[in-house]
Amino acid sequence: MATFQAHFFAAVMCVGVLGLSKLCGADSCEYPDCVFTGLPRSSGVERYILLLNIIEVPDDIQQQCDILIQRAHNCTSQRTGCSRRVEESYDRRFYDGAYVMYLLDLGVYVCGHLSQLLDLKNCFTPKLQESVQSCINAAYNIQCLLDQYDQKNNCPPNTDDYFHTLVNNWLANNPYLGTGADRD
């Protein structure tokens, strides 16, 4: 059941949040150029989570996930072992199958924990956001992120756990961590 849910939510993210609907039918990590034509420079997952723009998470994100779930009924995800294809240019990172799969998995996590994300948004202040974002400079300084958050937040304990998991289990595993291609 857990595997089905993982595939289902990967399909959900495939269809909507990332705008990569053609990936749903891809049989390998060799994605054709047309898949990426017209793709926004930053996906929602990148904009709000990877860059820690927590206070800008849209209020209707739950509604967006509900719509994505409906769309996912017509999409079968193809989970493949994507090899690394590190792209030095930020614009070309979507040609790296491992990065695309990372974003899909991160989107699954975010969609599966929306209540915690919204709780985090409710206690995040502009000052806290600025403090944690100061720890991102071509790479994540994981200890700085955790320290800045722990020193400057008024968030409930469950939100603290969510932020720590997001940083330790997701941001720390960004395939573009430290490559210089992980920021606009």
Curated annotation (Swiss-Prot):
Keywords of the record: Disulfide bond, Glycoprotein, Secreted, Signal
Compartments where located: Secreted
Post-translational modification: N-glycosylated.
Tissue expr: Highly expressed in atrium. Moderately expressed in the pericardium, pulmonary vein, nephridium, arteria anterior, ovotestis and connective tissue. Low expression found in intestine, lung plexus, diaphragm, subesophageal ganglion, ventricle and digestive gland. Very low expression found in columellar retractor, pedal nerves and cerebral ganglion. Not expressed in hemocytes.
Keyword Signal: yes
Disulfide bonds: C29-C34, C65-C111, C75-C82, C123-C155, C135-C144
Signal peptide: 1-26
Residue positions with a glycan: N74
Any GO CC annotation of this UniProt entry: extracellular region
Coiled coil, from the record: none
First-listed, main subcellular location of the protein, grouped into a coarse class: secreted
Protein name: Cysteine-rich atrial secretory protein
Species: Achatina achatina (Giant Ghana snail)
